[in-house]
Amino acid sequence: MLSLVSSEGYINLIERRVDVAIRAGSLHDSALRARHLFDSRLKLVAAPNYLARCGTPETVADLAQHTLIGFTEPKTLNDWPFADSGNTPYPAVPHLVANSGETIRQLCLTGNGIACLSDFTVATDIASGRLCELLPGCALNAAKPFHAVYYSDNAVSPKIRVFVDFLAERLGGQKED
């Protein structure tokens, strides 16, 4: 049986009986095996109707005058890698929060504010004009790694290995020996 669980929060694979999780950002649990899948840059985006109604920010400091959409957890997802000068990420204080990147994307698409989302999530929306990229010249050079993680034991199930190999091949990672 295949069961998919969607969560932006940290889950304990053993407690939840999860075979494989996709994690974004730095990995902290050394008890897990990890396979790099791809890197993704973050982009600030808003819908054209939001920008027509509220104006387009011209600097990172201007974001303080806008409705920001962010994550409930982890809070580090609200440290946006954008700066007018220096390398300090912008500490976004969201007016709307959600626990799902897809929910945040939908809130953004419907003109509810500005969000910071992974480029793989919003690339099609930007290309089609449904979302506008904001302040690309202020982006810090920070790509977020995405990994498949799974419990580390001596005998990884062949099904898990094949699935992780498939993800890595499909998403651009390297095949594990």
Segments predicted by a language model, with ranges:
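Short, well-ordered beta-strand core segments
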Residues: 19-21, 43, 68, 115
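Flexible hinge/capping segments at coil-to-helix
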Residues: 31-42, 46-68
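Secondary-structure junction motif
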Residues: 64-86
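Hydrophobic hinge/microswitch elements
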Residues: 89-134, 139-141, 150
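C-terminal effector-binding regulatory domain of bacterial HTH transcription factors
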Residues: 123-128, 138-177
